[in-house]
């Protein structure tokens, strides 16, 4: 396959899960990574260096995703930005004629999800969201076995995940890395004061309301998706149960409530 026949790819947000997107595209002979988008200049250049060693061509590093969407060499985009950017990234990409793959969760809130669907239909572009669990051979086979009656009638599914994690620590006023374009990183979110309230800038946005969705939007999509997949459910829930308690780490909080929702 010649370079002209390959599908041109732009990966948006490459510090964490975006690195896995890069790895998968590099394994596929049909694709060529042509643009890397990240608001952290150091991260973008590091990824471009690694890609050049593996595919020969060095992608163009940019901090503004709109440059990738305007690039005729780009056919598709995948994005693994913080959650608050997911919907707008997909909508802008489809407006520019690109198909879009969005890392879970597909959006920061439900209204953004409906806007993505509307954009996909309006511009005639593909928009997909997924998790690595959907591509896991073991999980695929387990779900098929269960749905074929392998363990009898299933009436209840519980999504559980146990991981050894450090405390997210106390809220505070933490420094933003000098190589980060914070205005671009914040994008459609409201600016807060202090701007960064957790110590690990490139991960702790999960615990900041304007950018993430807590663990419900971080680990939650994996467990809820597998449960719904296994049960064959394709409708929205009609009831929600909440329960809580302060468990494990005693990070600083202004309230005394810890709530799980399911």
Where would I find each of the regions flagged by the language model?
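N-terminal Rossmann-like dinucleotide-binding module
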Residues: 1-54, 133-136, 227
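A structural signal for well-ordered alpha-helical segments within the folded catalytic domains
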Residues: 19, 87, 91, 114, ...
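Conserved SAM-binding strand-loop segment of SAM-dependent methyltransferases
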Residues: 59-64
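N-terminal Rossmann-like NAD(P) cofactor-binding module of classical short-chain dehydrogenase/reductase
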Residues: 76-78
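Beta-strand-loop-alpha-helix segment that lines the small-molecule cofactor/substrate pocket
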Residues: 82-83, 87-135, 149
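Basic phosphate/pyrophosphate-binding loop/patch that engages nucleotide-derived ligands
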Residues: 118-125, 141-156, 174-176
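Core domains of carbohydrate- and sulfate-ester-processing enzymes
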Residues: 158-202
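Rossmann-like dinucleotide-binding domain that binds NAD(P)(H)
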Residues: 183-262
